[in-house]
Amino acid sequence: MKRVYVNEEWCLACHLCEYNCAFANSGMKDMVKALKGKKIYPRIQVEVGTDENSRAISYAVSCRHCEEPLCVKSCITGALHLEDGVICSDKEKCVGCYTCILSCPYGCIMPSEEGNVIQKCELCTKNENGQPACVAGCPNRAIVFEDRGVPSAEEECAFDEEGGAE
C-alpha cells in the first residue's frame, strides 16, 4: 500500500504541505478564497526542532495508517475504521470524545475546525486529488507517496525511537 513518507533532510519547514492539505480538504475551488486570512486546519503538521548536534531539523507529521491502529481500536462509536488500508473517519458517528487523539502514538489526530469532531489524514481519498495534496505541494520532494512494502512492527515504532521519519 502506498503511504506518505518524509525525508527530514529535505524539509525546509515552508509549511506548503499544510496549506495544500487545508485547501484540498476545504471543498473550495479557489485557494485564496479558501485560506487567505483564515486559521488553517491541515491534517499534516510541520514539526521544527533540533537534532542531537543542535542543528535545525524539520519534518512533516501525518497519519501513518498503522496496520493495527490503536485509534481505531479505541474509538467507542466506530467512527474510525479501515478502508483498503486507509484509516478513515466518519463525522456522522464521531461524538468528539477524543479517545482516538489520546491513543494515537504519533499525535496525528486533531480536533476539526468546528471543534466537535476529529480530523485526520485520509490520503486525500475523499477529495479530488489523485495523490495526497501535501505531496503534490511540496516544492522540495521532502514528502513522497510510495509503496515501500508493509512495514514491520519495528519499523512502525522507528519513528518514536529515533525521533525522525522514515
How would you describe each model-predicted region?
Residues 1-166:
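Non-ligating segments of multi-cofactor redox enzymes
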